[in-house]
Amino acid sequence: MLLYLENENKKGKVSDKEVHLYKHNGIWPKDTPKPRSPDYIGENGKIKYPDDDGYKIPPKPREITLKKGMKLDRYGDNLGSFVCPFKEKKGVMPYEKRSLPYENNEAMQKTYKRYEALEDINMESVERKIKMSGNDKLIEKIKELKEKNKFHSPKIGKISPHFDQEGKGTQIKLPISVENLMQLDFIKQIP
């Protein structure tokens, strides 16, 4: 069993032994984002995320079209699909408002990234561009998401309190991962 820090990717995984050491002795690999508590790690070695994709309900999150030029940010690698709106005048949304499972330490701060939308992003534009790309893996991924009724336009809503964090920030769940949106030239990473 491995604890995957982000979307079961191959980088950032932590071995059974390391999870065991953390759960029993509080020891965690130095350069890896550290969960706030061993209690947030399930028996399967994965983070136990809140229900409803971490949205504070009511109200339910609403589907939107991300407009060209909109700025976004996130902590973590590009394999995730959750971002926050970034507004120059307000600056970075405070970490505790994001209800993330990891400690706000140097390893986590190194994962912070910002992005800009290069064109409007919604369910239709993503599906159209994926079909045009001829990328069989992405085409199959969209088919599977549709079958599970999990393919949607970006959803925006308030973040629920979780992981001993206050929440109350705003999050957006993208239709596919940041990495996939970058591959399709929907968004780019910015300084």
Which ranges hold each PLM region?
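Catalytic toxin/effector domains delivered as secreted proteins or via bacterial secretion systems
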Residues: 2-191
